[in-house]
């Protein structure tokens, strides 16, 4: 089994095992490793030893392939110690009921009942095989889930940058990493810019560690055991599985897979057992409760039978067979398989559920808090408008750059509009930029805003000048400062200039002058001019554009370090409005969710005008902006209780930060809401963890956000949340349906034998027949109900309450009615057949046995949906169900028509008229349930009409 090592937590929350785990970690980390060797080598020595280039990485793909053959893939593989054969044999030993059946077969053999002994042995083999296959499917399904979120990284190889799976890395590869990334291997850092890494999942220390490219002097640690540099002191090493909290950097891979510090620890801890999901625990408890009731009933049946003078061996065999059939030991397994297969089905629809319990929660979500950018919108930014104070003077005179509305000269380009302030605005967008061009894909890679700014240069015939200047320092964008700044050294005059881009309000706040359209002159900004800039920015925002401000600061002293305090007295150059259109399917998805009683809240860093415009486009109701929109500033002034009181009317949070998300989730959960929260950044992680369903983005999401989330949208599309909630509700309905099928069959089988014993009638079913019914009840027909296609109308129902039970009052009524129907029909056939000669013959038990099996198949057909008729959902929409029922009926025909099986099940041939009679009677369970569904639908329609009128 190959687990994604980056999804594993090294510190178990169970306090009883914490010391053992910490000791194992310390032992693993004290061993020699590549990180220990390379931390004491200089950058040049490391590059020489690994024969790689500090700018281009490995020089050829062949070299990378050779190293992969030598070192293996960058994966941590946990070998399964137990063979399939051993696992299969363990099923005979671990189940007490199976051991009792084996004992029964042995007793039968010694008493000369060879036929019974052979029959029971064959039945045991079939029952164990079915159970083993179920467990194997469950394990394989869960293994598949571990591979759904592969780790990725930014690789530079052969001078080309690409985004690849971390498993493809080899020693010598050059890797770039930035804030939010998870380190994909053990890496010798060769460049670090304000780099801090969270190593808590490796060392247990909560404080992020500052990293540099400086070599560690080994002689400084001669006082340590064996002169080993402690793992926490290797400041030039970035460890696999740790998280970049601040800044960015690059480095050379020195260790991969198990040859890493993380791998060493992971290997020692792969035997830690994973906890069961709440639903599995519920099923375990339900199974135990039903087992207790079943044991009491079976014990009474056995005792009464023996008192009545029946054969003790016969009663023992029937009792054990009943125990095997009636006790739903397969419930947790089928639930796990259903959940896992549902998760795999969701993955095909672009929603990767990382934790099985989340599937249960999805059906209860009644509030979705969604980011705007990249989730509700397409995340493909294009520069739509550009405005400069001196060149354009008022909000009406804006340079339109939309593809369909471009203002161009006769030559078809925008070069003639390059006034000094326009040129400088575009230059700032060029230099305040970390996007890069991929030769392999011939596109820009990076932040969508950065990409849009670089793409716009060509329209003005301006080159990308980043390789002609030297970036001295960078102040990365974050949600608090809401701007990005770079300190650039111009090689021509050796002067440094700070270039700044960010939210227009923040840029305007720090600006005291503006750039003229000619001659690189600046003038002081007046309050009237600031009002004009604000007016223009708000005008762009009201059109749904994201508005950025641009400014610069010329440093008199080039040695002045770039800090946040330095960002003041800026020279304003211009505004750029970017368009990020809504995703095509978002409006329909929101409409469906609103119909299903889900409150949609949009959270954005944009201005109120931009947010309201987008909300109206995608169908989020904004009746009164004063009530429906809440800004981040107002949110800061409110307590959680105050927010909880007003949030029912709020659909938009504007100028919000990731920190605000935490307040929003707290307020919603305080009200008792079940919250799904989307996020993609490092600072989103707390809110994602606190929410009931944290949803991260697969494309633009940081590794930190993915780690904190319960679900990953691989297409970053909001409408995928709709399909996930739909699947979650559908899976829960399917679990209820197969529970109804299993428990009604179990109750019917128990009651049938109990009634026969109570009224001193011969047993209508023998041990082999009961075991066959168990195979049908726990086997393919039951599992096929778990994969019933989702009914899209589940979204018209309100979210399920968190406290709702699986076995609701309605479900209990349904399964008891079904069981009663099966009992009455089967007893009727048994008594009718026995009354003809007053004896129990092979024909009597064959008719009773076949009647029960037919009832079972019609019951399974009825259980495909709780309220819809089979004629509405269609007979052929669940292929697995049709195959399962077909095989079950074929098996039943073998049991009554093939001599070998006749001797095992004690059956005889039935005529066509017998089969038709049994089909007619057993179909009654299907007809009764269809009538129940019809009554339920009419009642729901009447209730809906009544409430609509009210």
UniProtKB/Swiss-Prot annotation:
It catalyses: Ca(2+)(in) + ATP + H2O = Ca(2+)(out) + ADP + phosphate + H(+). InterPro entries: ATPase_P-typ_cation-transptr_C, ATPase_P-typ_cation-transptr_N, ATPase_P-typ_cyto_dom_N, ATPase_P-typ_P_site, ATPase_P-typ_TM_dom_sf, ATPase_P-typ_transduc_dom_A_sf, HAD-like_sf, HAD_sf. Residues 2-92, 134-288, 345-814, 863-884, 931-950 are cytoplasmic. The keyword Acetylation applies. The chain crosses the membrane at residues 93-111, 117-133, 289-309, 324-344, 815-835, 845-862, 885-905, 910-930. Residues 112-116, 310-323, 836-844, 906-909 are lumenal. It comes from the Eukaryota. Present with 6900 molecules/cell in log phase SD medium. This is Calcium-transporting ATPase 1. It comes from Saccharomyces cerevisiae (strain ATCC 204508 / S288c) (Baker's yeast).
